[in-house]
Amino acid sequence: MELWYTEEHTDKVRFSIKVDEQLYSGKSDFQRIDVFKSQEFGTFFTLDGLMMVTEKDEFIYHDMIVHVPMATNPNIKNVLVIGAGDGGTVRELTRYETIEKIDMVEIDKLVVDVCREYLPQTANKLDDPRVSLFFEDGLKFVRSVENKYDLIIVDSTDPFGPGEGLFTREFYGNCFKALKEDGILVNQHESPYYEEYARGMKRAHKRIKECFPVCRVYQAHIPTYPSGHWLFGFASKKYDPLNADIEKWNDLGLKTKYYNTELHKGCFALPNYVKEMLENVDE
């Protein structure tokens, strides 16, 4: 009998992957966690039936959420990562020798434990000596921090369930306070294509705009995420990613599979329908 993983992108659209075997299924205090093995996408894991990471395309997401801010300000030393239990964001950050400290706050320890066992491709740098793991609510964590971080990356689930609090105005305001005077905030910004996801994207963008003087959106193609068209939010107290001297990034000699400095400029060029959504977030 064939086994398929199927995810509802809307009540009228489904996305399926043929599965060789299910490697893990469990429930934490926060969510259901499943790990599958497939020929097309390798090992992949889901939370509450929603795709989080696949071995085949994770490099796209993790390249774009990390290297865009790091190229914008190469002097980043202290980083806060919220969510990111699979470890891929931390893995990319540890490639920068100039980074001195990475605090990772993940509400669900079981996610990290499962990814350490089944997804070493992404979780293999969580033991880097610069990394400190905190298993607590990211919303509460940033409330008590002030003027500490050069970069905050919000690598969260979608804006419902355990990740819901990470899309509020209070949260973004606390992130602003936790950042130093030239700090950068980057977050996964949902998809603009399907209505439910677009609603979440517009709501988050509106709230970030209310907190930060520099507020931009960039995009990437991620095949296993709803519609494949995925957005990231870039907010900053000082740096505009389109005016930064990003060519210095090339001198680092980092080998990436997706990100490059030409793409850095191009990824901020958005389709008209997305630009119109972002311009009309106040309506």
Curated annotation (Swiss-Prot):
UniProt-listed Enzyme Commission number(s): 2.5.1.16
Entry keyword set: Cytoplasm, Polyamine biosynthesis, Spermidine biosynthesis, Transferase
The protein's annotated pathway: Amine and polyamine biosynthesis; spermidine biosynthesis; spermidine from putrescine: step 1/1
Localization, UniProt: Cytoplasm
Residues at which S-methyl-5'-thioadenosine binds: 31, 106, 137-138, 162
UniProt catalytic activity: S-adenosyl 3-(methylsulfanyl)propylamine + putrescine = S-methyl-5'-thioadenosine + spermidine + H(+)
Pfam families: Spermine_synt_N (PF17284), Spermine_synth (PF01564)
Catalytic site positions: 155 (proton acceptor)
Domain PABS: 2-237
Biological process (GO), any one: spermidine biosynthetic process
GO cellular component, one term: cytosol
Gene Ontology MF: a single term: spermidine synthase activity
InterPro entries (alphabetical): PABS (IPR030374), SAM-dependent_MTases_sf (IPR029063), Spermi_synthase (IPR001045), Spermidine_synt_N (IPR035246), Spermidine_synt_N_sf (IPR037163)
Protein origin, superkingdom: Bacteria
Enzyme class: transferase
NCBIfam families on file: PRK00811.1, speE
Family of this protein: Belongs to the spermidine/spermine synthase family.
Function: Catalyzes the irreversible transfer of a propylamine group from the amino donor S-adenosylmethioninamine (decarboxy-AdoMet) to putrescine (1,4-diaminobutane) to yield spermidine.
Annotated protein name in UniProt: Polyamine aminopropyltransferase
Upper classification of the organism: Bacteria, Bacillati, Bacillota, Clostridia, Eubacteriales
Gene: speE
